[in-house]
A protein has these predicted regions:
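An exposed tryptophan-centered "aromatic clamp" motif
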Residues: 100-127, 131-188, 192, 206
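Bacterial N-terminal signal peptides that target proteins for export
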Residues: 1-10
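Residue-level recognition of phosphate/Mg2+-coordinating polar/acidic sites
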Residues: 13
Length: 207
């Protein structure tokens, strides 16, 4: 009897020990570290979480600093990135990774013709965000900027005149960008979204 009880206790203990510890939930404003962990690992900070999906384990993080003011690419050149001719269609674009990959796959000298994309550290999974991703970023800007400040990053400025490129293309002549108020624009009467215009570039990555 004692042996059976001991065997059962050992089995229960083994099961408890063998169960993996649940990963802590990720929140907007958490720090992304170099080892791809989030929260407060104490490692090297590389980004700030600005969106978390339904699993509470995965989402998107924005880089700590801008890459400068760069042009998107040449005007009147068709790219493999799908055209988004309406604001609704542009906001539905959540795949900056795919957009960036398509541009970087072109045979042209990328650094000359597509500076905003060349600035991305794509080999380490950083990419130019799509319009839908920029909108998510702007909606959580207070939390994101607080965390950026805490780790010595550059806050995302809402100073009038600041404009941020997305990887979402409007047409052969222009691409979408976000202004300092979080509004999205392409080429129109008021805002000139021609691809050769210089705008702020900030990378994001998925985790």
């Amino acid at each position: 009897m004692c042996k059976n009880v001991l065997r059962q206790l050992m089995t229960v203990l083994f099961i408890v020990v063998a169960l993996p510890l649940a990963k802590a939930q990720v929140h907007v404003g958490d720090i992304l570290y170099e080892d791809n962990s989030e929260g407060e690992s104490g490692g090297k900070a590389i980004g700030v979480v600005f969106y978390v999906d339904g699993t509470k384990q995965h989402g998107w993080a924005v880089a700590l600093n801008d890459e400068g003011e760069l042009s998107w690419g040449p005007n009147w050149v068709n790219t493999p990135v799908p055209d988004r001719l309406s604001l609704q269609g542009a906001l539905a674009d959540m795949d900056g990774y795919a957009n960036t990959k398509k541009i970087l796959s072109l045979s042209n000298p990328i650094s000359i013709f597509y500076p905003a994309f060349e600035a991305m550290d794509f080999s380490n999974d950083w990419y130019l965000p799509a319009v839908g991703q920029l909108k998510k970023l702007y909606s959580n800007l207070d939390k994101v900027n607080a965390s950026l400040s805490a780790v010595g990053g550059t806050v995302i400025s809402t100073e009038e005149g600041n404009e941020f490129w997305s990887s979402t293309e409007y047409s052969v002549s222009s691409s979408w960008f976000m202004d300092w108020n979080g509004q999205m624009h392409s080429k129109d009467v008021t805002y000139n979204g021609t691809k050769d215009g210089r705008r702020i570039v900030r990378a994001v990555r998925s985790f």
